[in-house]
Regions:
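N-proximal low-complexity "stem/linker" segments adjacent to membrane-targeting elements
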Residues: 2-92, 99-101
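C-terminal catalytic/acceptor-binding lobe
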Residues: 18-30, 256-298
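Short loop/turn segments at strand-loop or loop-helix junctions that form parts
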Residues: 54-69, 112-113, 136-146, 219-222, ...
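Phosphate/oxyanion-binding active-site loops and adjacent basic polyanion-contact surfaces
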Residues: 76-87, 160-169, 192-196, 273
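Alpha-helix termini
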Residues: 93-103, 129, 175, 204-212
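Active-site-proximal specificity loops/subdomain of glycosyltransferases
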Residues: 112-180
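Conserved catalytic core of nucleotide-sugar-dependent glycosyltransferases
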Residues: 149-152, 162, 176, 182, ...
Length: 298
């Protein structure tokens, strides 16, 4: 064991995957946040880009069923059900690894527009007595709607629902400018797996350290991205594989560094309705690496 440590090797007991050189259970997560990524059988990757903090910004509007469509949502439930389940899934995913989030600063912020008091009370009830910081903010619609071109890229009038959505996106980017490190922008119709947040943090550290660059992570593996033949790079995260993509919707994780670098491009989605809506994001992904998990985390 002493010789293995000197030469940087790990010993694994094949009968139970115990790692005596590190005194770890290989069946659990042997990686150490901010220090090393340990993947069986690939070995150790030193973390040169540690995650210092994570801000999760959830945009909610429990009163609007579908933003730009008239059809019903899957399962045909009230929109508030999707908003509440999204928040519940995020808090459950965070609590799935409290040890990880005790080592980095974590905050959950909700920017809400037009949800009734009953739903807001339920948001606060879910966030009450959690070990991480949280707050529920009201969308400043008057401030941000003034900055929106009311005629979209197709020459049509922008709908009221879209104006509130674009304003919410703008406010979330303004908040992100004052965050510490990573920011996860989330729409209120994504149900997260228990290991979703943990995987995104460990994958970001590992892949960013290997490539020596900042990243954009999308938690979903969108089926529509398989409709065309495109080259894709595949990376090993913590427990999932990740592949490079050039399109996302408005739910993604990235760093404050990239937000500041492309702030005008990011906020252009909240000033002009493009087609597709996320086109400015896609232009950024032509210059920066965006990856998504296989299979999806949310």
């Amino acid at each position: 064991i002493k010789l293995s440590r000197i030469f940087g090797f790990e010993i694994i007991d094949q009968s139970n995957f115990y790692i005596p050189t590190s005194n770890k259970d290989g069946l659990k997560n042997p990686s150490q946040i901010g220090k090393e990524s340990l993947i069986i059988p690939m070995g150790k990757t030193e973390i040169t880009r540690p995650v210092k903090s994570l801000d999760i910004i959830l945009r909610t509007c429990a009163s609007v069923n579908m933003l730009t469509q008239t059809k019903k949502r899957i399962f045909e439930k009230d929109k508030s059900e999707y908003s509440l389940k999204t928040l519940n899934s995020i808090t459950n995913s965070i609590n799935n690894n409290k040890e990880l989030f005790n080592k980095i600063h974590l905050k959950v912020t909700i920017i809400d527009h037009n949800s009734n008091q009953e739903i807001l009370s339920k948001f606060n009830e879910i966030l009450k007595n959690q070990f991480f910081q949280s707050e529920v903010l009201k969308l400043d619609l008057d401030l941000y709607s003034k900055q929106i071109d009311k005629i979209n890229e197709e020459g049509k009038e922008v709908s009221k629902n879209q104006i509130s959505n674009m304003s919410n996106i703008h406010q979330s980017f303004e908040i992100a400018k004052n965050c510490g490190d990573l920011i996860y922008f989330v729409e209120d119709d994504y149900i997260h797996k228990l290991d979703a947040i943990e995987e995104m943090i460990f994958a970001y550290e590992r892949i960013s350290s290997q490539l020596n660059r900042e990243l954009i992570l999308c938690p979903s593996d969108y089926p529509y991205l398989y409709n065309s033949l495109e080259k894709s790079y595949v990376f090993l995260g913590n427990k999932y594989h990740w592949r490079s993509i050039e399109e996302t919707l408005c739910t993604f994780l990235t760093s404050k560094t990239l937000i500041n670098k492309y702030f005008n491009e990011f906020t252009s989605t909240s000033k002009k309705e493009h087609y597709p809506f996320e086109k400015p994001f896609h232009n950024i992904y032509k210059k920066e690496l965006c990856i998504s998990p296989m299979p999806a985390l949310a």
